[in-house]
Regions:
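Fe-S-dependent hydro-lyases/dehydratases of central metabolism
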Residues: 1-431
Length: 431
């Protein structure tokens, strides 16, 4: 029997998740499957003063190798600025000197935290494959980019070759039905998921956030989801780009590009479902983001310090949320409220909107646009203090003092707690 091979139909490509499509593009393949190991071309590499030059410069000097493409490298000075001691001055000086030596075109010095500055400056768009020298680099996934954190050795390889191998992950879809109530936000969604699945629940796979509640979020709220996918143990935290994405990017000078950056309906994924309409404000107890329960379980916890800061919790949307609670109110006696806006741009807009005035009038101290206490730098958290913070992590000693008890909450919850002196439900203030 003769078979006419020319008449055979071409097999349809297998359905792909968003993560698979992003990796396939970077690998130059029509499709990839979970478990495949592929070599990906890097569109963008980002690092900061702590993770970058002081570690990369000696290794690059030893190799005698040039950077593969300076236009695809972004350096942000955010961890040790403003420098407060000799070690910090040395680290920051090394970064600045190396940036000049390498003639890097994209250097952002003391204007905010890298994960906020990067999209703010128009460096991200859907379809990109990016790496960052920081564990919260998955923030880029909010824009439909495949972005994750890598260490100095892997970053060295990227600097020289512009490529990196990855094992294609499975996709875990966190599907949120319903809509969030006033006073409940993306930070509460993330704390709830981390509390439910633990800090290894993501299994270094690709987490995709989906559903009506996610689509209703602003870009900066989506950034909070992707940012804290790191605390969920995921490699990346993706959100399907939509009109909200492109409108936000257009305001940063990013032109729309074509691409089918969404999961195919029949693509294989592990799906977990949640109802946003029933979610209450969440609080994580010391010393893990996984120690999460509803806010009412912490009503008797007195606080000494309320901190609104970090890439997770001090963006413009976060500052607005805190101000909505603090307006015409004062911080409780004996409580210190510190606010470190995540970027100079967001602080400037917040000034124009009157948000910063509300925070100051409530008694807040305004700190520089940097990682600050989240990175344990600056000695701003007293020993033995009870702290409620908008940061992403509350490991022992994370904010500097090994004896501080750090609780995590949303900007709404932190602000409400600051005015009552106890961990408090912001919905009671906003009602």
């Amino acid at each position: 029997m003769t078979i006419d091979t020319d008449s055979r139909a071409t097999p349809a490509p297998p359905p792909q998740t968003l993560a698979q499509k992003l990796i396939a593009r970077a690998a130059g393949r029509p499709h990839v499957m979970p478990g495949d190991i592929v070599n990906c071309q890097v569109d963008l590499a980002m690092f900061h003063d702590s993770s970058g030059p002081r570690r990369l410069k000696p290794m690059l000097d030893e190799l005698g190798a040039p950077i593969w493409d300076r236009s695809r490298v972004v350096l942000v000075l955010d961890h040790y600025v403003p420098a407060q001691d000799e070690d910090a001055r040395r680290i920051v000086g090394t970064a600045r000197d190396w940036a000049r030596e390498q003639r890097l075109p994209h250097v952002y010095d003391s204007i905010g935290i890298c994960h906020v500055v990067l999209p703010e400056q128009g460096h991200l768009r859907p379809g990109m494959f990016c790496v960052g020298g920081d564990s919260h680099s998955p923030t880029g996934g909010a824009f439909g980019a495949y972005m994750f954190g890598i260490g100095a050795t892997d970053m060295l390889g990227v600097m020289v070759k512009g490529a990196l191998w990855v094992r294609v992950p499975q996709t875990i879809r966190m599907h949120w039905d319903g809509l969030l109530a006033p006073g409940v936000c993306a930070k509460d969604m993330m704390l709830h998921m981390i509390g439910r699945f633990g800090m290894n629940g993501g299994g270094y796979q690709a987490v995709e956030f989906a559903g009506p509640a996610v689509k209703a979020l602003s870009m900066q709220e989506r950034m909070t989801l992707s940012n804290m996918s790191a605390e969920l143990g995921a490699q990346v935290g993706l959100v399907e780009p939509d009109e909200t994405t492109w409108r936000w990017l257009a305001g940063r000078g990013v032109e729309r590009v074509a691409g089918d950056w969404r999961s195919d309906p029949s693509a294989e994924a592990i799906v977990h479902r949640f109802d946003a309409s029933t979610l209450e404000p969440q609080v994580a107890a010391p010393h893990s983001p996984a120690n999460t329960e509803g806010v009412d379980n912490f009503a008797e916890v007195r606080i000494d310090v309320a901190y609104i800061g970090a890439c997770t919790g001090a963006k413009l949307e976060d500052l607005r949320a805190a101000a909505s609670v603090l307006r015409n109110r004062r911080v409780a006696a004996g409580v210190r409220l510190s606010v470190a806006p995540a970027s100079a741009h967001d602080q400037r807009v917040a000034e124009e909107e009157g948000v910063m005035r509300v925070l100051r009038d409530a008694g807040a101290d305004i700190l520089p646009n940097s990682c600050g206490a989240c990175a344990g730098y600056g000695g701003s958290i007293p020993d033995g203090a009870n702290v409620i913070s908008t940061t992403a992590r509350n490991f022992r000693g994370r904010m500097g003092s090994p004896t501080a008890q750090v609780y995590l909450g949303s900007p709404y919850t932190v602000a409400a707690s600051a005015i009552s002196g106890y961990i408090s439900d912001p919905r009671l203030v906003l009602a």
